[in-house]
Amino acid sequence: MIRKPIWPYLVVGLFSFVIFQSFYHYYQLSTAAVPFMGMLRLRWLLEHWERFSFGVFFDSGALYAGLIGFGLPILVYASMDKNLYRQGEEQGSARFATLKEMRRFEDVDFEKNMIFSKQVKMGLFNFRLAYNVQLNKNVIVIGLPGDGKTFTFVLPNLMQMNSNFVVTDPKGNLVHEVGKMLEKAGYAVKIFDLIRLTNSDRFNPFHYMKSELDIDRISEAITEGTKKSEYAGEDFWVQAELRLQRALIGYLYFDSKDPETGVQLYMPNLGHVADLLRNIYIEDPDVPSPIEQMFEELNEHQPNNYAYKQWKLFQNFRGDTRNSVVAILSSRYSIFDHEDVRNLISEDTMEMDTWNTKKTAVFIAIPDTNNAFNFLSSILFAIGFEVLTHKADDILQGKVPGYSRKNLRHIQFIFDEFAQIGRIPNFAQVLSSIRSREMSIKIIIQAVNQLESLYKSDWKTIFNNCATHLFLGTNDKDTMKYYSTRSGKQTIRTRSTSKSHSYRNGSSSENKQIQGRPLLTPDEVARIGVEEGLVFISKQNVFRDKKASVYDHPRKDEIASSPEDKENWYEYTRKGTDIDGLLLYANDLTLQLKELFVA
């Protein structure tokens, strides 16, 4: 922004002050020699120029002359245009960022950086960076299949091994490629396989229920994760089934604990909710159903408990409404009738409450061609964020003996093929609040509309809460337009020439103009090189760079590219669930139901 400065006029004014004084003094010398005005005095001035000298004089006439000389440039300045000018930026000031500007965000220790492109990195830990480059570490990565999202972003950042990781693993290959490297570095590797549903760690939401408040959290996570649409008219049915769902989950929560000692009598799972739903219908209105008897018995042992209250609210529904609610919830839980799914959630080996204190890498294998079971990953993330947030808060507030801030490990959630996961409850709020808990999220999508279709009105909030965007490619017009606008406008100068010819003579003219144009038009955004990417960092100009590569990383020889690489390919076996033991212990609820049916 340019305003015409006054200081050049002040300097000229000072010179004018001296010059006017000096000429006045010289003129006074001529008056003494030639008393008459006219050509004689002018001749004397020209002939005796050697007597002229610069100086400052303090007689009144010289001072007046000097003030006149000083005032003339000031008058010129006062009469000039006072508007602000931005020369070269009249239509926009956007430009490509320089490497020097990007280097400010780096940590001096290479391993403590996130890798965005061949030359751009950002320190993962703000306390190691200058205050003016401390940003949140949430990242949006956009690229088409084949643009190298995994090869140029996910793998290089896993190879940094500078934090804990929770990574979605489309196709399930990633853990094989980096698992051995991570284990050698001391990481505990967890695998939640939603592709094969076997040879996997187990995840049981009931394991993380510490109070009756968790009944609501888990119920809402399941409802949100299995929701098929956002139709507003469904809200009544959603609220109605939540009452029943809270009642059933609450029943399992209270019934599985000794009311006096709090000792866990058995570990329920979501498959037991499906068992309860199968036996909820009333065949004879005069005879209480087995489920009704179970709730009454629970209330006798634990009066006025939360599950019983929710059950009584559900009992207010009658006839078709009641049957519809049961049918909706039964449909939602029918997925747990598959033995492989039931086995996957029968116990818990994920150990979520250690993810931010113990060196851990978690891989969630999700199919990219069928999302029938992917809702389990959204439930896992919803519960995981709750568990880890509370654990981090307790550590930061000094409530966990033996732990302090220095024991809190940063967790990077890397959501490859984010649209396949399903909707995570309260995700926008989570994204905006986890920074202070040493967590960050990397969202990898193919186009903006994927996020918009999944999170509706929240997608802009999610975008705005990511300080860094890495663009690798797209064919989506809205995405092109978004990043073209984000790149900004620049000022350019255009020159046009016109010529005219006639029989006797010709003429030509040249016209120069200032115009504005996007730094990158939408089609230019789409046409970046196959090996290129655009790095957008909050409050900075866009940086155009080559993509990062696994082959440029110092640990390139520690990862595997195929099963033929026996030295680095990671093979694993996860302990199978003891079905017989589960039936004797955790399936105690099913035995109770059978006894009631016989009675």
Show which residues each predicted segment covers.
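Short secondary-structure boundary/capping segments
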Residues: 181-182, 206-208, 457-461, 485-490, ...
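P-loop NTPase motor domains
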Residues: 21, 135-439, 454, 523-544, ...
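Short loop or secondary-structure boundary microenvironments that flank
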Residues: 366, 370, 417, 445, ...
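A broad, low-specificity signal for short, low-complexity segments enriched in glycine/proline
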Residues: 98-105, 119-131, 151-152, 321-327, ...
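Basic- and hydrophobic-enriched, low-structure N-terminal and domain-boundary segments
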Residues: 1-147, 151-154, 493, 501, ...
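Short alpha-helical interface patches
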Residues: 46-51, 60-114, 212-223, 272, ...
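Conserved ATP-driven motor cores of ASCE-family P-loop NTPases powering translocation/secretion/packaging/pilus
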Residues: 431-433, 440-534
